[in-house]
A protein has these predicted regions:
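Flexible, low-complexity linker and terminal segments
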Residues: 3-10, 162-377
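Flexible glycine/proline-enriched surface loops and loop-helix/loop-strand junctions
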Residues: 132-135, 234-235
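Short amphipathic alpha-helices within nucleic acid-binding modules
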Residues: 147-151
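Structural motif
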Residues: 75-77, 101-103, 138-140, 166-168, ...
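Short, flexible turn/loop "capping" segments at secondary-structure junctions
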Residues: 128-132, 271-272
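Flexible, glycine/proline-enriched loop segments at strand-loop-helix junctions
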Residues: 134-146, 163
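Thiamine diphosphate
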Residues: 1-128, 135, 152, 171, ...
């Protein structure tokens, strides 16, 4: 049945996650993500799932790893301070290849910062927060409807590539209320984990079949031991000191993402085809930027915006294509310039790059963006 529901971004995340098959949530209340825990506590029992409020953020991350390891699609939610506490176990999930979704509704920092104010200060942390080289997928929605649809995508990518996925909201989008059209009867792609089918590899939980990059999941609850560790390990899942095996594992963990960037990444390009000025934005910042583009287009200016929906891995190919015909790129972020570094790395030789940031906990307004455009002309 098709219905249009007024809901908050945080609530839409829960509904999308449940549609994707999420049946376990472990979390600890923290502004501005608390509504995700509250909604999960109500909705999961209705769907045969389980909600647990953990003693802290560290335990929350550990709990969803454990639930996912035995086959239950799992999610947690937090904000900046809690995201910091989760980093060690996020690395564990990367190494053990345990699919899960971590929602980070960003708020102004550092430290406790401004708990109810918007920020995009955790973008680099989503990429580099845990130690060592590790695979990363991070997705950033800009509307309540995207909170619903992209939550499904987060789970699909987590299951397909056996990796934690960060759903990187900001306070603007998390607390935004909009109408969302939901059709429970319309088919939506939901990817479930692939299980081992070859008996000869059942005792090798990390064996990768020829031509594949991701090991199929071991059937748990049977008479075959399934060892999970954060240490470098061989196909049998047991720790190894063999440098060649450890190197091959680390390479595969990275390549299973790098080789499939085209499948993972998605962008939105708005009026970029003939644009002399392209604004790069993401998340809630897009809402002010879209107003700017429409306003200046009405005055005859050639301007558009490029929005990475997948912020990690960054959509390099798509950005280079847009920058090839642009004269100027303006990066607009609620931070001191984090995606700015990626933009400069990728297209600094193709066009002029300017930046507008905000770290005082207020929304970047269309007027501020237009003023910046006029200043750098």
């Amino acid at each position: 049945m098709k219905k249009r529901i007024l809901m908050q971004g945080n609530e839409a995340v829960v509904e999308g996650a449940i549609r994707a098959g999420m049946r376990f949530f472990a979390g600890y209340p923290i502004t501005p993500s608390t509504e995700i825990a509250e909604q999960s506590a109500v909705r999961l029992p209705q769907e045969g799932g389980h909600f647990i409020q953990m003693e802290d953020e560290i335990g929350s991350m550990a709990a969803i790893i454990g639930a996912s390891a035995v086959g239950v699609k799992s999610m947690t939610a937090t904000s900046g301070p809690g995201f910091s506490l989760k980093q060690e176990n996020i690395g564990y999930a990367c190494m053990a290849e345990i699919p899960c979704v971590i929602v980070n509704v960003q708020r102004s920092g550092p430290s406790t910062g401004l708990p109810t104010s918007p920020s995009q200060g955790d973008v680099m942390q989503a990429r580099w927060g845990t130690h060592g080289d590790h695979p990363v997928i991070a997705i950033s929605p800009s509307s309540v409807e995207e909170c619903y649809m992209l939550a499904i995508k987060c789970f699909n990518l987590a299951e397909k590539y056996r990796t934690p996925v960060v759903f990187l909201l900001d306070e603007i989008v998390g607390h935004l209320r909009e109408g969302v059209e939901i059709d429970d009867e319309q088919p939506i792609e939901v990817i479930d984990r692939r299980m081992k089918e070859r008996p000869d590899t059942m005792h090798l939980p990390y064996h990768v079949d020829e031509g594949e990059d991701v090991p199929r999941f071991h059937l748990t609850g049977y008479d075959i031991r399934y060892n999970i560790t954060g240490l470098a390990h061989g196909e049998d899942g047991f720790p190894t000191n063999n440098n060649e095996i450890a190197g091959a594992l680390n390479t595969r963990l990275m390549q299973k993402i790098d080789k499939h960037v085209d499948d993972i990444t998605s962008v939105e390009e708005y009026k970029c085809d003939d644009a002399d000025t392209v604004i790069v934005c993401y998340g809630g910042t897009k809402r002010s930027v879209m107003t700017v583009v429409d306003t200046l287009r009405a005055k005859g200016e050639k301007i558009g915006y490029f929005r990475p929906i997948t912020v990690w891995p960054f959509p390099e190919k798509q950005l280079k294509k847009v920058a090839a015909h642009a004269k100027r790129i303006l990066v607009v972020e609620h931070n001191y310039g984090q995606i700015l570094y990626e933009v400069e790395r990728i297209v600094k030789d193709d066009c002029k790059i300017d930046f507008l940031g905000n770290v005082k906990g207020t929304v970047i307004t269309p007027a501020e963006i237009i003023k910046k455009i006029e200043e750098v002309r």
